[in-house]
A protein has these predicted regions:
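Pre-Walker A adenine-sensing motif
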Residues: 4-16
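Conserved RecA-like helicase ATPase core segment
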Residues: 295-309
Length: 309
């Protein structure tokens, strides 16, 4: 009878209706992990044809957990969702060299960010040059001029998206301009034969001026590929400086930095539909707030042991 009761309760969770947040509490060994995996399999089955594994994320406490469950869903006839740790998620989103391990951010600071960005106006000092290998490709002043093309668009994700697209065009024009210079042509002549073949699939031997420019552009696009990534990641925005100006806080904690970046740029995964967080009691409130904002359109399933909180 006890076993039947447990199975009945587990089935209720597995087949529970879609809700923004589903909290499952239980002590160690109570079957939470089994319920979690069966819930994922059930969601895939119920939404077959519309739900893809890339729409489902499992936030695990450590990489060992991912290894432990990697064969369970395939045995049930389903593919595995992406399984990551919170540390890995932060490492993907933070600038290079920034340690994901940091002091906790008070929730009040995150709510203050929500209020502060409503009145945000970008300043020149909030921007940085897009610069690689000592070459300034787009200046902070040029970025500010792009922003000023949209006087009726408030500072925030929409304006950042518009400027980001303008920056891609500006970078493309700058590289084409550089490709026509004699200095870049000289650089191509100094490439080793192996490098020429790798870049152009043949030794560098242009027959026309246009061919020479095309080869130069290919070379520059690879050389400055980091600039494309910097634009994509909105690294031309000085989030720390914006935070200091809006909040009066220097050296923002990781959670506050991420939250501010998401509020200003729209950073996030809007395609995620379900996010499962195991051992939820191990996360701080600010970490949960960051995940809720990053996966802003997703429904959450939270599993934890209140006795370990």
């Amino acid at each position: 009878a006890i076993t039947a009761t447990i199975q009945k309760e587990q089935n209720l969770i597995i087949r529970h209706e879609d809700v923004p947040a589903l909290l499952v509490a239980g002590i160690a060994g109570s079957g939470k992990t089994s319920v979690l995996l069966q819930r994922i399999a059930y969601l895939f089955y119920r939404n077959r044809g519309s739900l893809d594994p890339r729409h489902v994320f499992l936030i695990s406490p450590n990489p060992v957990f991912a290894k432990y469950i990697e064969n369970v869903l395939p045995d049930l006839g389903e593919r595995n969702p992406e399984t990551i740790t919170y540390h890995d998620l932060c490492a993907r989103l933070l600038p290079a060299g920034r340690n994901p391990q940091d002091k906790e951010s008070p929730l009040e600071l995150l709510w203050k960010i929500d209020r502060a960005v409503e009145g945000l106006r970008f300043e020149l000092a909030d921007l940085r040059d897009i610069k690689f290998y000592g070459v300034r490709l787009v200046s902070a002043g040029a970025i500010m001029q792009l922003m000023q093309k949209y006087p009726n668009v408030p500072a925030g994700p929409h304006l950042v998206t518009l400027v980001r697209e303008e920056l891609f065009n500006r970078l493309d024009a700058r590289l084409k301009q550089m490709a026509a210079t004699e200095a870049v042509q000289d650089e191509l002549l100094c490439l080793s034969l192996d490098e020429q073949v790798r870049l152009f699939n043949a030794p560098y031997d242009p027959q026309t001026e246009q061919e020479a420019r095309d080869c130069a552009l290919t070379y520059l696009q690879e050389r400055f590929s980091g600039a494309v990534l910097a634009i994509e990641r909105d690294e031309w925005l000085r989030i720390d400086r914006i935070g200091m100006r809006l909040l009066g806080v220097e050296n923002l904690p990781v959670s506050a930095w991420l939250y501010l970046n998401m509020a200003v740029t729209g950073l996030g995964n809007p395609d995620a539909r379900y996010v499962m967080i195991d051992e939820v009691q191990d996360y701080t409130p600010d970490q949960l707030a960051v995940m809720a904002r990053f996966f802003r359109r997703a429904h959450f399933m939270l599993l934890g042991d209140p006795h370990q909180a």
